[in-house]
């Protein structure tokens, strides 16, 4: 049988510690917090590897064998109902591989939804619940927390993009969750978020329910030299190596952000070039290839914007992390009006085209940023 060779540079999800670069100290710290029954607020920009770190922590032997590990991403949730839906689905997904006795206990706790759970031909449960089936989200949430409290093992629940709850139309969600989490002694939580300003307010402001409720962890870019060693260890499988200069170019081109570096390395690993030593030109060609592949998707994305919104987006990409969009210098350089910018920037922020973090504006998607710079 022909064996398909695995590309070791994973760009979606988590496979195993072998394909996870470094984060040894961060994994140890997160593991220590959770096993010491501390909740954690994990704060870092998107695509820096927060979810990978959480999964890597969950794969540690003393975690994997002794806890039920649950991960949910609430980035796309828009209200309390959708949060409860995502939490219930995430728990069932985590419990299904652990056998009938484990997941059946959870389903028996969900009396408010029991009639809407279906089963496949093998008798395994499927989350066939519709959002409209959650008629009383507070009651369903109580049932979920009753399960967490009574589960046969302690539970670790990671909620990714946790800052989303602050944008729900229901303004009491933070207090609702804080109260239940405070009274749940059989579970600990990782609150992971990418919008640092919002997360900092949620966990350090005296007026917010989660004030001083969790240990706060930041995440920095992986050390460049460590990442280079990881890259060459795996490139060697395909009889390739990347030069230190080429990797430095790649690393700094994307500010050390893991996902983009992984994506380019993924492409270089399978490139048809017969060169054994990859140089800076090879990295440039790899990036150009990715931008070419994404061209039509980006065209469709930009089609959603008005001409003025697109003009501002291009200006931010060209300027490279401007600190002010209302300065006369910026407005004149890109032929923008102040009123135009005020209206457009809110749309771009709300729709996650751009982010404002640490005093600067930048595009959320660095490949899109490079594409706009190239014209």
Identify the meaning behind each predicted range.
Residues 247-253, 259-273, 311-314, 346:
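C-terminal helical "lid" of AAA+/P-loop NTPase domains
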Residues 34-35, 163, 255, 269, ...:
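Short, locally clustered residues in the helix-turn-helix/winged-helix DNA-binding domain
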Residues 2-7, 292, 296-375:
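C-terminal leucine-rich, beta-strand-based interaction scaffolds used for sensing/assembly
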């Amino acid at each position: 049988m022909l064996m398909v060779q695995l590309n070791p540079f994973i760009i979606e999800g988590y496979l195993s510690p072998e394909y996870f670069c470094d984060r040894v100290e961060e994994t140890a710290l997160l593991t220590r917090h959770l096993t010491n029954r501390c909740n954690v607020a994990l704060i870092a920009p998107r695509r820096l590897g927060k979810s990978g770190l959480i999964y890597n922590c969950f794969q540690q032997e003393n975690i994997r064998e002794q806890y039920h590990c649950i991960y949910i991403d609430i980035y796309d949730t828009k209200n309390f109902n959708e949060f409860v839906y995502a939490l219930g689905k995430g728990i069932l997904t985590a419990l299904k591989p652990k056998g009938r006795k484990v997941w059946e206990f959870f389903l028996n706790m969900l009396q408010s939804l029991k009639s809407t759970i279906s089963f496949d031909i093998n008798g395994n449960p499927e989350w066939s619940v519709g959002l409209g089936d959650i008629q009383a989200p507070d009651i369903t949430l109580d049932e979920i927390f009753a399960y967490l409290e009574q589960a046969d093992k302690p539970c670790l629940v990671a909620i990714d993009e946790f800052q989303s709850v602050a944008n729900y139309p229901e303004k009491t969600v933070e207090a609702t969750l804080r109260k239940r989490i405070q009274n749940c002694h059989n579970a600990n939580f990782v609150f992971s978020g990418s919008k640092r300003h919002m997360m900092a307010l949620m966990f350090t402001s005296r007026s917010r329910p989660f004030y001083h409720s969790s240990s706060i962890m930041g995440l920095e870019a992986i050390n460049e030299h460590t990442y280079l060693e990881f890259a060459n260890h795996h490139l060697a499988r395909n009889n390739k190596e990347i030069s230190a200069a080429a990797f430095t170019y790649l690393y700094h081109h994307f500010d050390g952000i893991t996902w983009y570096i992984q994506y380019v390395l993924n492409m270089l690993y399978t490139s048809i070039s017969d060169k054994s030593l990859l140089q800076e030109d090879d990295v440039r060609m790899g990036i150009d290839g990715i931008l070419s592949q994404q061209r039509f998707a980006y065209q469709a994305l930009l089609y959603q914007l008005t001409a003025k919104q697109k003009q501002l987006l291009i200006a931010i990409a060209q300027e490279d992390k401007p600190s002010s969009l209302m300065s006369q210098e910026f407005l004149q350089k890109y032929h923008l009006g102040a009123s135009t910018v005020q209206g457009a920037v809110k749309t771009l922020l709300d729709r996650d085209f751009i982010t404002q973090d640490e005093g600067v504006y930048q595009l959320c998607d660095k490949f899109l940023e490079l594409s706009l710079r190239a014209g």
